[in-house]
């Protein structure tokens, strides 16, 4: 999504004596990369999913935020961690029950990553990952 957006405003005022018409446009840079998706955690309870497994075009060092929503079941999140070991309700930094959502800011300078797991192999998470262009 990085690129440019054009903001255009056209204003026309009539009926007050002197008609006025003003047009203006401005190019705005959009310095954000974003990816989103829906993932069924089919390896739940055996292998967690690492954050960078979700993204294909944003480097881990460029990621600055993650929106997560538990669409089905219970989602376990481990922050500032790497690896694919399993996470439980006792070891998770954050637990999202079905329907709950959260935004997690990510420190790209000192972040090892993020790991997401589920309580069952049918649990699913919806995600949006934001990164600097």
What are these regions (language model features)?
Residues 13-54:
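Transition segment at domain starts
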Residues 63-68, 112-116:
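Buried hydrophobic-core signal for structured, non-transmembrane domains
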Residues 2-21, 25, 117-133:
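C-terminal interaction-tip segments
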Residues 105-123:
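Noncatalytic modules at the cell exterior or secretory-pathway interfaces
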Residues 49-60, 104-108:
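Extracellular and analogous surface-interaction loops
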Residues 60-63, 69-90:
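Short, surface-exposed beta-strand/strand-loop-strand elements in extracellular ectodomains
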Residues 88-111:
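Intrinsically disordered, low-complexity Pro/Gly/Ser/Thr-rich segments with frequent PxxP/GP/PP motifs
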Residues 2-4, 40-42, 50-56, 67-77, ...:
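Surface-exposed, well-ordered secondary-structure segments
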């Amino acid at each position: 999504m990085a690129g440019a957006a054009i903001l255009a405003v056209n204003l026309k005022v009539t009926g007050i004596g002197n008609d006025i018409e003003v047009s203006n446009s401005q190019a705005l840079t959009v310095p954000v990369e974003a990816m989103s998706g829906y993932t069924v955690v089919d390896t739940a309870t055996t292998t967690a999913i690492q954050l960078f497994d979700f993204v294909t075009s944003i480097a881990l060092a460029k990621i600055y935020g993650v929106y997560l929503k538990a669409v089905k079941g219970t989602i376990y999140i481990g922050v500032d961690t790497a690896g694919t070991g399993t996470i439980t309700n006792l070891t998770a930094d954050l637990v999202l029950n079905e329907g709950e959502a959260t935004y997690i800011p990510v420190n790209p300078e000192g972040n090892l990553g993020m790991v997401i797991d589920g309580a069952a192999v049918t649990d699913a998470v919806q995600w949006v990952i934001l990164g600097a262009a």
